[in-house]
Structures are given as structure tokens and as C-alpha cells.
């Protein structure tokens, strides 16, 4: 019930601008471009405690920058960094790089149905990339967190060529 109310509130919050959507097995994402940033609602509907997930940006699968979500002790932590298609993320010092900080609006984990949902605001100029331009976005399923260390993700990320201003 609470999860549904939060999802409806987030969708209504996105309704004031053109909202884009990605829905694929295990993921639901909504985003909109406004005020030189991208407001992203990221949901992974198949993530367990002590796992990580994320979204990477870039056409080169071996050189992605992204926002990563760690679920540990049923709490969600948000960090930024870089990764490859299967590698665990390398985090930026203090989670930011080159002044491009990500603002977390909400981050929740629902252990009873293994769903993680977060709303983040990402600056268009993000870690040396212009997210306003068309490029691949890659939804990373999950990797384990073992003794505080992130392991490789075992499945290839789902990708989509995204032009944030066009909702393609």
C-alpha cells in the first residue's frame, strides 16, 4: 500500500514536465529534463539485501559513469562513480567528481518484495559527460555486497539509447 502511494506520488510529481519511461523485466524508471538536470526515479523490483544496482551512462560499455544504489541492512545508499559492463563500480571520492553532485530526493527498500526505489537529481554535466545528448543508458541488475566489498554483476546490463529531451 505504502509502495503504491509513493509510486503514484512520484508519477504525479513528474507529470508537470514531459516524462520519459523505461520498463523492462526487473526495472521501472521515469525521468524528465528540467533546469539543467535530469530527475530520475529508478526502481529495481528484484534486488535482495546486501546487493547493489545502478544506472550507467555512455555508449562504451567499458567506460560508463553512473549512479549506484547499495542495499545493505535494508537501507539504501547512493553513490556516483564509474564502471564497466560487468565490473563493480569505482566510487568517486565523496561520491562526486568535477563538481557534479547528485541530489537524492528519496531512497527506499522494501524487503518483503525485494524492491528498491530512489529518486535522484542528476546534473546534465555529469562526470565529464553531457547527459543532455543522446547516448546509451544501461540499467545494471545487481551484484553482491560481501564483507562491505561490491562484486561484479553477473548479467549484462539492459541498455537503451536515450535522448532525454525527446523521450525516445
Swiss-Prot record:
Pfam families attached to this UniProt entry? DOMON
Annotated region (Disordered), positions in chain: 148-168
Q: What InterPro entries does this protein's entry cite?
A: DOMON_domain
A GO CC annotation given for this chain: extracellular region
Residues in DOMON domain copies: 25-143
Top-level taxon in the UniProt lineage: Eukaryota
Going by the UniProt annotation, this protein carries glycans at 35, 94
Check the UniProt entry and state the signal peptide residues, or none.
Answer: 1-17
Query: What PANTHER family does the record point to?
Result: DOMON DOMAIN-CONTAINING PROTEIN Y73F4A.2 (PTHR36516:SF3), PROTEIN CBG04168-RELATED (PTHR36516)
Q: What is this protein called?
A: DOMON domain-containing protein CBG21753
Species this chain originates from: Caenorhabditis briggsae
Taxonomic lineage: Eukaryota, Metazoa, Ecdysozoa, Nematoda, Chromadorea
